[in-house]
C-alpha cells in the first residue's frame, strides 16, 4: 500500500473525520437559521432586522449552507475513495504472518497450487445464483502436535432479485473414510445430480439429514455414527456453521460455512487506518478459533463418522461429541479474538 499523507490519514480516522463533519454540520444549521431569519425579515410584515441586513443574512446564510453541503459531500466521497484505495491492496501475507503466530500452529502457509478444486462444491450452489471465485485460496497448516490440515477458503456472491449477498465456506480434504461414493447434507439442500455428483441418484432421509448414494449401493445411515451426525455435523446449536461431507472413494471433503469476515483484511468503515494491522491481528485470532473448531470436526471425521459397529457397546456418546460452534462474526471496529470451545473426550 502506498504511503498515506497526513491529510489522507485524517480522512481514514473515523474519530477525527466525524468531528470534522459535525462541525461542518453545525455551521450548516446556523446558516439555515440565518437564512430563515433573513427571509422572514425581508418578506414578513414585521421586520426583525433592516432590509439591508436581511439581504445580507439571506446571502450569507445561503452561501454557507450550500458550502457546508458541498464540503460534507466531497469529504464523504473522498473518504469512500480512500477506503477503496486501501482495500485494493492484497494483505494475505500479513494475515498469514498473524495466523502463523498463533501458539497452536507450527506452520501456516499458502499453497501455490493446492489439491482442492472449486468444482468440488456441490451443485446445490447453482452457478446462476452463486458466483464463486474460480481459484480458491488454499492453505497447509501444521499443528504443534504433528497433525496437518489442508483446506481451502472460497467466497461467492449469492444473487437474488432483492439483493446480492456474500457467502463463504471452508473445504478440507483428507483420505477417503469409506470405499463408497456418497454425499451427506442437510435436508433443505437438495442435490442436483451433475458433475461430481451425477451418479448419486438415490437419497435417504433421517430426521433433518439427507444421504445421497449410488443406485443399488449398500451404503446407508447404518454405516454412519449417529452421535457424530446428531451432535457434530448437524447439531442445531451450531447456528453459524453448516456442514456437508462428500466422499468419492479417494478423498473425503468436509465443507463448512463460515462468516464472510473469515480472513477479512479489509479496512472497515468504522475502523481507523492506523489500527489496520492491529485489527488484522485480532481477525487472525478469531479465524484461528474458527479453524480450530473446523480442525476438530475434520479429526473426528477421520475416526468417528464410520463407526466400529462390531464394538458398538464400548463406544459412548460422549466419545463422539464435540462442540464445533462457530461464533457470531465480529462487526464492530474492535475485532476481538474468540476462543473455540474444547472437544469433549
From Swiss-Prot:
<feature type="compositionally biased region" description="Basic residues">
    <location>
        <begin position="333"/>
        <end position="345"/>
    </location>
</feature>
<keyword id="KW-0472">Membrane</keyword>
<protein>
    <recommendedName>
        <fullName>Uncharacterized protein MG456 homolog</fullName>
    </recommendedName>
</protein>
<feature type="region of interest" description="Disordered">
    <location>
        <begin position="326"/>
        <end position="345"/>
    </location>
</feature>
<dbReference type="GO" id="GO:0005886">
    <property type="term" value="C:plasma membrane"/>
</dbReference>
<keyword id="KW-1003">Cell membrane</keyword>
<keyword id="KW-0812">Transmembrane</keyword>
<feature type="transmembrane region" description="Helical">
    <location>
        <begin position="23"/>
        <end position="43"/>
    </location>
</feature>
<keyword id="KW-1133">Transmembrane helix</keyword>
<feature type="transmembrane region" description="Helical">
    <location>
        <begin position="56"/>
        <end position="76"/>
    </location>
</feature>
